[in-house]
From Swiss-Prot:
Biological role: Involved in chemotaxis. Part of a chemotaxis signal transduction system that modulates chemotaxis in response to various stimuli. Catalyzes the demethylation of specific methylglutamate residues introduced into the chemoreceptors (methyl-accepting chemotaxis proteins or MCP) by CheR. Also mediates the irreversible deamidation of specific glutamine residues to glutamic acid.
Family matches, as PROSITE patterns: CHEB (PS50122), RESPONSE_REGULATORY (PS50110)
Compartments, record wording: Cytoplasm
Record remark on domains: Contains a C-terminal catalytic domain, and an N-terminal region which modulates catalytic activity.
Domain of life, per lineage: Bacteria
Organism for this UniProt entry: Rhodopseudomonas palustris (strain BisB5)
PTM text: Phosphorylated by CheA. Phosphorylation of the N-terminal regulatory domain activates the methylesterase activity.
Name the UniProt record assigns to this protein: Protein-glutamate methylesterase/protein-glutamine glutaminase
Main location: cytoplasm
Family of the protein in this entry: Belongs to the CheB family.
Catalytic activity: [protein]-L-glutamate 5-O-methyl ester + H2O = L-glutamyl-[protein] + methanol + H(+); L-glutaminyl-[protein] + H2O = L-glutamyl-[protein] + NH4(+)
One Gene Ontology biological process: chemotaxis
Length: 385
């Protein structure tokens, strides 16, 4: 079966094969729920619905899935044990770990990311709660579509010389464009930066751990505030990983806490993190309001609120992630005289958020992840080149 690319006038004649999704979960309820959601989508199909990790390992070569949704807790062979075996048999398999929100499962999910899983998704405690099930559905389908789509685009590019009649490429994210050389870049702000703000989503944990390990001199002298799209418990674990990577203090922001240099503050899962000025000091204000850009915590609330505190002294970085969160806040930062750096497409797991910022023309630089850290060190040391 092939499906025409929808919503893109430039590619109305292009077709692609639906993403093949393998569901691996010992819960028949979860398998049935995910199967129904996937089968209702025009750009994906259920390649297999399996009960154990052992079933998945034994059948993955025959099934040939593009994406696997892999439960952590299963009989015979659990998700974390099955993960490396699946990747050994199919190196390009996109694996999304699924687990309930416990500390143990959060820790296992982080281990899975280090072993090659592409992403994770928290399963609702009960699928009977409509709002929780709707959020799970929205997030899961988005992850399958965007993560699977990137692999298809890479495969399509690698085989483009063969000029196949049937394109194996799903609709690209809205901001995944052609040559980055064509992106309009603006000069860095003239004011020396006094705070570092970072926003990230899919692929963010690994990117953040890599980045903070390279900017110790920045953290020592300036506050660093981060919003990563993540649920509660997961952000607690991420803060611990950031502290180990940076070898500097890192923790979830606390409502009313004074922001100080030498600290990394991470937005806690399920709450927006803003900054306000009180008595001449920058103070964290946690917000339990509705999601922004479908996310909570979201990047835009952090970016926007920081302007009232640091004005033109803001340097913001938008890392890998789906959607466009951070773009509007980045626009306001630039309008106030600050600067924005975006991660480039090649080094991003998903070039949604950084792509939105780059294509909006608000970035002073669009860089590979391994060049962002050294650039930040130079900028905070006064080198504006």
């Amino acid at each position: 079966m092939s499906v025409a690319l929808a919503g893109n006038p430039a590619s109305t004649s292009t077709q692609y094969e639906p993403l093949r999704v393998m569901i691996v979960d010992d819960s028949v309820v979860i398998r049935g729920l995910i199967s129904r959601w996937i089968e209702a989508e025009p750009d994906m199909v259920v390649a297999a619905s399996l009960r154990t990790g052992l079933d998945a390992v034994n059948q993955v070569e025959r099934i040939k899935p593009d994406v696997a949704v892999l439960d952590i807790e299963m009989p015979e062979l659990d998700g974390i044990s099955a993960l490396p075996k699946l990747l050994a048999k199919k190196r390009d398999l996109i694996i999304i770990m699924a687990s309930t929100l416990t500390r143990r499962n959060a820790e296992i999910s982080f281990k899975a990311l280090s072993l090659g899983a592409a992403d994770y998704i928290p399963k609702p405690e009960s699928t009977r709660e409509a709002s929780a099930a709707d959020i799970f559905k929205h997030d899961l389908l988005q992850k399958i579509r965007h993560l699977g789509g990137k692999v298809r685009r890479k495969a399509s590019a690698a085989s483009s010389t063969a000029a196949p009649a049937l394109m194996r490429e799903p609709a690209a994210p809205a901001h995944s464009v052609a040559s980055q050389a064509a992106l309009v870049k603006r000069p860095f702000g003239v004011t020396a930066p006094r705070v570092l703000l970072i926003g990230s989503s899919t692929g963010g944990p690994q990117a953040l751990m890599s980045l903070v390990s390279e900017i110790g001199s920045v953290i020592d002298h300036y506050p660093v505030l981060i919003t990563q799209h993540m649920p509660p418990t997961f952000t607690t674990i991420l803060a611990e990983h950031l502290m180990r990577s940076a070898r500097r203090p890192a923790h979830e922001g606390v409502d009313g806490e004074v922001v100080k240099s030498g600290q990394i503050y991470l937005a806690p899962g399920g709450r927006h993190m803003r900054v306000v000025r009180q008595g001449g000091q920058a103070v964290i204000a946690l917000d339990d309001g509705p999601p922004v850009n479908f996310c909570k915590p979201a990047v835009d609330p952090l970016f926007n609120s920081a302007i009232d505190v640091w004005q033109s002294g803001i340097l913001a970085v938008v890392l890998t992630g789906m959607g466009s969160d951070g773009m509007r806040g980045g626009k306001d930062i630039v309008a106030a005289g600050g600067s924005v750096i975006a991660q480039d497409e090649a080094s991003s797991v998903v070039w949604g958020m950084p792509g939105a910022a780059a294509n909006a023309g608000i970035c002073a630089a669009v860089l590979p992840l391994n060049q962002i850290g050294p650039k930040l060190v130079r900028l905070f040391s006064g080198d504006r080149s």
